[in-house]
Curated annotation (Swiss-Prot):
GO molecular function: acyl binding; acyl carrier activity
Protein name as it appears in the record: Acyl carrier protein
Keywords per UniProt: Cytoplasm, Fatty acid biosynthesis, Fatty acid metabolism, Lipid biosynthesis, Lipid metabolism, Phosphopantetheine, Phosphoprotein
InterPro entries per record: ACP, ACP-like_sf, PP-bd_ACP, Ppantetheine_attach_site
Species classification: Bacteria, Pseudomonadati, Campylobacterota, Epsilonproteobacteria, Campylobacterales
Record family assignment: Belongs to the acyl carrier protein (ACP) family.
Function according to Swiss-Prot or TrEMBL: Carrier of the growing fatty acid chain in fatty acid biosynthesis.
Localisation: Cytoplasm
A Pfam entry, by short name: PP-binding
Organism: Campylobacter jejuni subsp. jejuni serotype O:2 (strain ATCC 700819 / NCTC 11168)
Protein's pathway: Lipid metabolism; fatty acid biosynthesis
Length: 77
């Protein structure tokens, strides 16, 4: 769950939300209140944090926090 904790920290910072709101099943837009600009900034922050590149075609598929965690875990393999 280390990746989740790191993703959660980035999400909390970028969206200025309470850490308790961020769960694996949380939808980034619907549940956490992100708009399209927030999502772009979140992806950029995740890329910087994890030193990865997330193409737009992949970023649009990252709906839930769980999707982000799994995607990053797969990149790190």
């Amino acid at each position: 769950m280390a990746t989740f904790d790191d993703v959660k920290a980035v999400v909390v910072e970028q969206l200025s939300i309470d850490a308790d709101a961020v769960k694996m099943e949380s939808k980034i837009i619907e549940d956490l209140g992100a708009d399209s600009l927030d999502v772009v900034e979140l992806i950029m922050a995740l890329e910087e944090k994890f030193e990865v590149e997330i193409p737009d075609s992949d970023a649009e598929k990252l709906i839930k926090i769980e999707d982000v965690v799994n995607y990053i875990d797969n990149l790190k393999k």
